[in-house]
Amino acid sequence: MSSRERKATDTAGRHSRMDPNLSSDDSQNPGAVAAANREVLDAGREDIISSGTERQQARKEKQDLVQEFEEPPNKVLQENREKFSRIMTSSFSAMEVKIKDVLKTQCEQRQKLCQDYSLQFTNLSRKLTSDAYKLKKQAETLSNMFMEQQKFIHETLTLQKNRMEEFKSLCEKYLEKLEVLRDSRGNSIAEELRRLIATLEIKLLMLHNQQNTAAPPQSLLDVLFS
């Protein structure tokens, strides 16, 4: 192996030995690593002998170098991919947990609010039903009282009317009896006078007869009340 091949091999070896200890910037910059790989390959390509054995050996060394240079970036990319996947999975998991917590809290708040409104509506409905029942009972009571008062007034008016009719009838009967009494009293007085006159005539005739028989004279009063 020529001095140039050894130099290229030593350079590749140094790059290979230094590669695991590269800084985070180099490990996270695949472009820079690929550029270094290309430079090393170009230098090795210029120094390789055109003989078959040396060419095969040089090709093998190049393949080894390529594998050595490509393995760390792929590993870094894989690690970064896995890390990013873990971060995304963790973020999505945390976001999902937060969303579930928010949805659960909102659901609980909605249920509590619904229960509160349902309880208030139930109590209000019960109060309205109770008030409506009380109002109905009061209306029925007032209606019954009004009907009773109306019935009492009607009965009172009917009774008063009957009493007025009875009083009117009694007054009419009293007037009729008073008129009859007045007429009968006049008739009885006339009859009494006629009876007294007839009695007086009879007594006068008897007196006249007695005078004719020479009896002592009597006064008119004696004749009337004898």
From Swiss-Prot:
The entry's keywords: Coiled coil
Listed Basic and acidic residues bias regions: 1-18, 39-48, 56-65
Biased composition range(s): Polar residues: 21-30
UniProt entry tagged with the keyword Amino-acid biosynthesis: no
Name of the protein described by the UniProt record: X-linked lymphocyte-regulated protein 3A
Region (Disordered): 1-72
Cited InterPro entries: XLR/SYCP3, XLR/SYCP3/FAM9_dom
Ranges in a coiled coil: 155-210
Tissue: Expressed in lymphoid cells.
Protein family: Belongs to the XLR/SYCP3 family.
Pfam family, one: Cor1
